[in-house]
C-alpha cells in the first residue's frame, strides 16, 4: 500500500484557502471515517484515520472553521494492526460540528450522504470532498491487471454522493458492494490520473503512471513474444485492421454516428490488439463479445455506405500492410 500512503501524505499537505472547500473536506473526512456518539445527551464526533498528518489536518481545519479543539488518541501498531491508528474526538461542540458538516440535519437526525451544498456547490468543493474521502478511507492499487482507486464508504448513500461529486469534476466512478462494504471505484486510468492531479497528488501520479506504462510495455512485449500460434497472429491482424477501419469510420461519420456505435468504435481504436472479449470487459457497462462485434460491424457498414454516397475512400482504404509490422 506504498502508493496509498504516498497519496495521503501528499494531499494532506495541500493548501486550502476557501472556507467552503475546507468545510467540504472536513465534511467528507468525517462522513467516511467518522462516527457519532450520544454521551449525556450531547453528540460526540469521532474520526479514526491511519495517518498523523491527516489527523493534524482535520484538527486544524475544525479549529479554524468552528473554533473547537479536539482530543487525539493514538493506538499503536500491534498483532492485529499493521500500523498506528489516530482517533480524533470532539466532546465539546460536537453537535455544532455535526450540523455544520451535514452529519445531521436541522432536526438532529443522522444524514447518510453528503450535503447538497457540496455536491451542487463549486467544483473546488467536490475536489475537496474527494480529497477528504481519500484521506479517510481511500486506496490506490499498484498498476496491474486491474488498476483502481477506491474509497470504502459507510453506506450506499455515501457512495452515491461521492460518485455524484466525481461526475461534477469529470471523473467516472462507480459503486460496488463487496462483503457488505460499499465502495466507490475509479478504474479508468485517465480518470485515476485526473483525480490524483485534482486532489493535489501530482508527484504520486507521475510515479503511478510511469509504473503503469512500464507494465503495459512489458505486457505487450510478452504478448507479442508468445504469438507463435498462427491463429493468434491472425486474430491480432484482424483486430488491428478492425481498429484502423473503425478509426476511418469515425472520421467519415463525424458527429452523425450513434453514441453506442461510437463508443464501440472508440474502444476498438484505443485498444488495437485487444480481443473482442477484452473490449467487452472494458465497456461501460460491460458487454458480450458478440454485442461488441455487432456494434463495430454496424459502424463500419454505416461508414462504408456514407463513403460511397460521398465518393470518398471507405474504411477498407485505412488497412495497409505497415499496420501489421508490430504483430509480425
Swiss-Prot record:
Biological function:
Involved in cell division and chromosome segregation.
At the top level, the lineage of the source is: Bacteria
- What is one GO biological process annotated to this record? cell division
Q: What are the protein's GO molecular function terms? A: DNA binding
The name of this protein is Probable cell division protein WhiA
Alphabetic keyword roster: Cell cycle, Cell division, DNA-binding
Q: Which residues bind DNA?
A: 275-308
Amino acid at each position: 500500500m506504498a502508493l496509498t500512503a504516498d497519496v495521503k501524505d501528499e494531499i494532506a499537505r495541500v493548501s486550502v484557502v476557501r472556507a467552503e472547500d475546507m468545510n467540504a473536506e472536513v465534511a467528507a473526512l468525517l462522513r467516511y471515517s467518522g462516527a457519532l456518539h450520544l454521551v449525556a445527551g450531547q453528540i460526540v464526533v469521532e474520526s479514526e484515520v491511519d495517518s498523523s498528518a491527516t489527523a493534524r489536518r482535520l484538527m486544524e481545519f475544525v479549529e479554524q472553521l468552528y473554533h473547537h479543539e479536539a482530543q487525539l488518541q493514538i493506538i499503536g501498531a500491534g498483532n492485529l494492526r499493521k500500523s498506528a491508528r489516530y482517533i480524533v474526538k470532539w466532546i465539546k461542540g460536537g453537535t455544532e460540528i455535526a450540523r455544520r458538516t451535514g452529519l445531521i440535519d436541522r432536526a438532529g437526525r443522522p444524514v447518510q450522504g453528503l450535503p447538497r451544498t457540496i455536491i451542487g456547490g463549486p467544483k473546488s468543493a467536490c475536489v475537496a470532498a474527494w480529497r477528504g474521502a481519500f484521506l479517510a478511507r481511500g486506496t490506490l492499487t499498484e498498476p496491474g491487471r486491474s488498476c483502481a482507486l477506491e474509497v470504502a464508504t459507510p453506506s450506499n448513500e455515501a457512495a452515491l454522493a461521492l460518485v455524484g461529486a466525481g461526475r461534477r469534476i469529470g471523473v467516472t466512478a462507480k459503486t460496488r458492494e463487496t462483503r457488505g462494504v460499499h465502495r466507490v471505484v475509479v478504474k479508468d486510468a485517465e480518470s485515476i490520473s485526473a483525480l490524483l492531479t485534482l486532489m493535489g497528488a501530482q508527484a504520486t501520479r507521475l510515479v503511478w503512471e510511469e509504473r503503469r506504462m512500464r507494465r503495459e510495455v512489458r505486457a505487450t512485449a510478452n504478448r507479442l513474444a508468445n504469438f507463435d500460434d498462427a491463429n493468434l497472429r491472425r486474430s491480432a491482424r484482424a483486430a488491428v485492421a478492425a481498429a484502423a477501419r473503425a478509426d476511418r469510420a469515425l472520421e467519415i461519420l463525424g458527429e452523425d454516428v450513434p453514441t453506442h456505435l461510437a463508443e464501440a468504435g472508440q474502444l476498438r481504436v484505443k485498444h488495437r490488439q485487444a480481443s473482442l472479449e477484452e473490449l467487452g470487459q472494458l465497456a461501460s457497462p460491460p458487454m458480450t463479445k458478440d454485442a461488441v462485434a455487432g456494434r463495430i460491424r454496424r459502424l463500419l457498414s454505416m461508414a462504408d455506405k456514407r463513403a460511397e454516397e460521398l465518393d470518398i475512400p471507405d474504411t477498407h482504404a485505412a488497412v495497409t500492410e505497415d499496420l501489421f509490422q508490430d504483430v509480425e
